[in-house]
């Protein structure tokens, strides 16, 4: 089940829908207002990185910011889904990282430009294997954590999400159709910060899933 779900996610999923500022403490640490409705943006599926892979920092950057998140894997086509039945459209869960080139994002924001280049590059969405839906009894009661070289950087509870899982599915499906294998990243708790070349990230959902990734410089082939 988990193997087939992750295969569908990688091969059939059409998009990664991300929810920004969905934890009040994280919005505050970045100097952003707490949103009154979900802040959503997209990442390409080409940014996926399987557990054990290497996160690549592109030249000339020296670091990326880590953001650990609960990922929802959509199990069936969803359009205009009522909040009351939204959980029926989840196929599974995963732990994911929304790696962010914060310098590029800040520069784009200051110029009033989109910031896909800051979040959509190859290896910028490391993700675990898919947890079957039955393994996660209450997605509103999970602990997310992230360590860099063994030092805890992030630890937060999904109950602190501003917009809960059923609402997110209903809201997003009212804007765009979600397909089997699509992924929703539900936001990150406070504690985001830089990770540099040569460091190692471990992250997980306590008691359910754990991932690890090395961080290295991206090396392009010689032209």
UniProtKB/Swiss-Prot annotation:
Superkingdom, taxonomy of origin: Eukaryota
GO cellular component annotations of the record: cytosol; mitochondrion
GO MF terms held by the record: acetylpyruvate hydrolase activity; acylpyruvate hydrolase activity; copper ion binding; oxaloacetate tautomerase activity
Catalytic reaction list: oxaloacetate = enol-oxaloacetate
Main enzyme class: isomerase
Annotated InterPro entries: Fumarylacetoacetase-like_C, Fumarylacetoacetase_C_sf
Interval spanned by the transit peptide: 1-30
Binding site for Mg(2+): 67, 69, 98
Cofactor dependence: Mg(2+); Mn(2+)
Extent of the signal sequence: none
Main subcellular location: mitochondrion
EC number in record: 5.3.2.2
Gene3D superfamilies: Fumarylacetoacetase-like, C-terminal domain
Single GO BP term: oxaloacetate metabolic process
Record localization: Mitochondrion
Keywords from the named record: Isomerase, Magnesium, Metal-binding, Mitochondrion, Transit peptide
Cofactor binding note: Requires a divalent metal cation for activity. Binds copper in vitro.
PANTHER family for this protein: ACYLPYRUVASE, ACYLPYRUVASE FAHD1, MITOCHONDRIAL
Family the UniProt entry places it in: Belongs to the FAH family.
Function recorded in the entry: Tautomerase that converts enol-oxaloacetate, a strong inhibitor of succinate dehydrogenase, to the physiological keto form of oxaloacetate.
Protein name from the UniProt record: Oxaloacetate tautomerase FAHD1, mitochondrial
Gene name of the encoded protein: FAHD1
């Amino acid at each position: 089940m988990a193997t087939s779900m992750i295969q569908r996610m990688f091969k059939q999923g059409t998009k990664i829908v991300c929810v920004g500022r969905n934890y009040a403490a994280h919005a505050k640490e970045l100097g952003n207002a707490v949103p009154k409705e979900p802040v959503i943006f997209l990442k390409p599926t080409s940014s996926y990185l399987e557990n054990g892979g290497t996160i690549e920092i592109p030249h000339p950057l020296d670091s990326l910011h880590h953001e650990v998140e609960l990922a929802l894997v959509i199990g069936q086509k969803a359009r205009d889904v009522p909040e009351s039945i939204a959980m029926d459209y989840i196929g599974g869960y995963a732990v994911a990282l929304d790696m962010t080139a914060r310098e590029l994002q800040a520069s784009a924001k200051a110029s009033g430009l989109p910031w896909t280049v800051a979040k959509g590059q190859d290896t910028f969405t490391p993700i675990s294997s898919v947890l079957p839906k039955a393994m996660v009894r209450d997605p509103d009661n999970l602990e997310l954590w992230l360590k860099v070289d063994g030092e805890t950087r992030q630890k937060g509870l999904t109950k602190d999400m501003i917009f809960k899982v059923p609402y997110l599915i209903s809201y997003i499906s009212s804007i765009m159709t979600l397909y089997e294998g699509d992924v929703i990243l539900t936001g990150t708790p406070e504690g985001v910060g830089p990770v540099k070349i040569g460091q190692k990230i471990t992250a997980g959902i306590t008691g359910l899933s754990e991932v690890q990734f090395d961080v290295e410089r991206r090396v392009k082939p010689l032209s």
